[in-house]
């Protein structure tokens, strides 16, 4: 979702309008590549916990932690890829290289599943003691996971940006994005259901082999369309100006801050282009020194900046302040995402000890349960855009702000964790009576998670895109991915802490108290929601006010 906005912006500023490359001739190449890569990435990541438990004899909690680390890398690496594409190589080379790296990783996973000596000996039926994986086994496994996560992360956001760059008209870009997300979710659902089902009921070798075939086809298709693509030119690092602000303010830390507009620098690196900000704001006043002109900062004859690391424009200073203002909200989103990703990992472990049979011949794969979140989120996003948000605007003559949407999502996330605690308590009682609980009891919490994500995920992107500096919008929208990545790492640490200090998370959760873990997450969620309300109360939007006035003149000022 983050690429929806970033790709649109990049498409308008990159590429040669007069070039014959690009256009709808690139459409099948882009979507075929996306479909294959989506099937591949979701096909292995959704069932990773089960693979580690069944094929590598790794204990359930440790498997959940490894899965969280892998998912964290999947979420963090897109930002690295976006920076590399924006600053050095462009999107097309990054996608090609990432697709090939992903192919190497999934081929190695297929070999691991095919060759017995690359895995520990399987546990004997009824045996408690199993052969643990050797250092060689783990080394090969981690190499494969590093390759597939790097490859998948390198294409997750750059595919949308590269696709948008092929079109000049915003209408065409919008049409492309509709197809882009339809294809993305189709691939995700296929990987999380069909591929996972094959892995559970046929063989891991066949499941990973199909992923490898999909990856290979997508790589060949993408490279085949290279001559038709419009190649975007790297625009330089968007973070340079931010670093310059810190350096300039530090160098001139003893300078006296002025109240006169003429004492501040109002031009960017190109002296003929004047920036929009007039006077630096009063917040974070120590940074205003970065734009304060001294006698050694300007070349009096040419009017140019002598040293760009000593003088920034007022706009560059204000851009940096905008990031600092968003940071407390960013932390709040991390703290609510951490319990959410931990919840999805624990539900997979719960599913493994439930009755997953639906009818005499079908068994729900534990790794496929998370597809409920994806399907629910898709449905609710459509309902929000076509029904809920228009109805709210009609009744109140106002639009829901991004922070209001995030708040709704946080409340729903807390409710889902509370419901998971109640369901787990019921499951433990059924285990005591000698009857496993039906897996259907796990569906309602996942549905609520999906509804909450439908409010939070687009709103987070809307918030970052609208409040970040224009020069950083391509990277800003991917910050949602960074949030998710950090949350996976924090959830891994939290699981380890709970294991060390309590008996709630043994390797056999039938003898644990996962319900207490959920209640702990509920308490943390409530505390974080209070922190979020405080941050939202004091936060002042940078751009939303004008947008609201334009969209609905009846609103007046906020």
Curated annotation (Swiss-Prot):
Keywords: Membrane, Nitrate assimilation, Transmembrane, Transmembrane helix, Transport. GO terms for molecular function: nitrate transmembrane transporter activity. It comes from the Eukaryota. Induction: Up-regulated upon nematode infection. The keyword Membrane applies. It is found in: Membrane. GO terms for biological process: cellular response to salt stress; nitrate assimilation; nitrate transmembrane transport; oligopeptide transport; response to nematode. The chain crosses the membrane at residues 33-53, 69-89, 92-112, 128-148, 176-196, 203-223, 329-349, 371-391, 403-423, 439-459, 478-498, 517-537. Its main location: membrane. It holds the Pfam family PTR2. One of its GO terms (cellular component) is plasma membrane. Expressed in flowers, siliques and root epidermis or cortex. Detected in shoots. It is a multi-pass membrane protein. Belongs to the major facilitator superfamily. Proton-dependent oligopeptide transporter (POT/PTR) (TC 2.A.17) family. Transporter involved in a passive nitrate efflux. This is Protein NRT1/ PTR FAMILY 2.3. It comes from Arabidopsis thaliana. The gene is NPF2.3.
């Amino acid at each position: 979702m983050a690429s929806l906005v970033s790709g649109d912006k990049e498409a308008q500023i990159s590429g040669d309008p007069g070039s014959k490359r690009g256009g709808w001739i690139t459409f099948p190449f882009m979507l075929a590549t996306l479909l294959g890569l989506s099937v591949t990435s979701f096909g292995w990541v959704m069932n990773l916990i089960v693979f580690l438990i069944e094929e590598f004899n790794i204990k359930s909690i440790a498997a959940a932690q490894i899965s969280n680390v892998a998912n964290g890398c999947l979420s963090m690496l897109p930002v690295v890829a976006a920076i590399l594409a924006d600053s050095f190589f462009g999107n097309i080379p990054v996608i090609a290289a990432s697709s090939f790296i992903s192919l190497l990783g999934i081929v190695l996973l297929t070999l691991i599943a095919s060759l017995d000596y690359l895995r520990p000996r399987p546990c004997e039926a009824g045996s408690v003691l199993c052969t643990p994986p050797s250092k060689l086994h783990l080394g090969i496994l981690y190499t494969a996971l590093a390759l597939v996560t790097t490859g998948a992360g390198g294409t997750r956001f750059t595919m949308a940006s590269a696709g948008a760059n092929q079109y000049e008209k915003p209408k065409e870009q919008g049409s492309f994005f509709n197809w882009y997300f339809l294809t993305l979710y189709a691939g995700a659902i296929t990987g999380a259901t069909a591929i996972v089902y094959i892995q559970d009921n046929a063989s891991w070798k066949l499941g990973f082999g199909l992923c490898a075939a999909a990856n290979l086809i997508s790589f060949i298709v993408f490279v085949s369309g290279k001559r038709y693509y419009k190649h975007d030119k790297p625009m330089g690092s968007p973070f340079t100006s931010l670093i310059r602000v810190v350096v300039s303010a530090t160098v001139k830390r003893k300078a006296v801050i002025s109240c006169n507009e003429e004492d501040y620098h109002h031009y960017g690196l190109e002296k003929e282009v004047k920036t929009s900000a007039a006077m630096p704001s009063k917040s974070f006043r120590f940074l205003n020194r970065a734009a304060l002109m001294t006698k050694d900062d300007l070349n009096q004859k040419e009017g140019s900046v002598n040293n760009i690391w000593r003088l920034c424009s007022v706009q560059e200073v204000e851009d940096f302040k905008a990031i600092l203002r968003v940071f407390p909200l960013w932390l709040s989103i991390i703290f609510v995402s951490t319990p959410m990703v931990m919840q999805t990992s624990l539900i997979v472990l719960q599913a493994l000890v439930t009755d997953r049979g639906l009818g005499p011949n079908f068994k729900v794969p534990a790794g496929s349960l998370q597809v409920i979140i994806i399907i629910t989120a898709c449905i609710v996003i459509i309902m929000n855009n076509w029904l809920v948000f228009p109805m709210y605007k009609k009744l109140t003559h106002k639009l829901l702000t991004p922070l209001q949407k995030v708040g709704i999502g946080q409340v729903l996330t807390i409710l889902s964790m509370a419901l998971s605690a109640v369901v787990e308590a019921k499951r433990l009682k059924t285990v005591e009576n000698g009857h496993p609980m039906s897996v259907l009891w796990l569906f309602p919490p996942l549905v609520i998670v999906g509804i909450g994500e439908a409010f939070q995920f687009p709103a987070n992107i809307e918030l970052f895109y609208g409040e970040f500096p224009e020069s950083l919008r391509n990277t800003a929208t991917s910050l949602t991915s960074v949030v998710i990545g950090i949350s996976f790492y924090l959830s891994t640490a939290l699981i380890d802490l709970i294991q060390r200090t309590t008996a709630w998370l043994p390797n056999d959760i039938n003898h644990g108290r996962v319900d207490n873990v959920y209640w702990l997450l509920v308490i943390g969620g409530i505390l974080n929601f209070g922190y979020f309300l405080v941050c939202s109360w004091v936060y002042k939007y940078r751009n939303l006010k004008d947008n609201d006035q334009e969209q609905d003149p009846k609103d007046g000022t906020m």
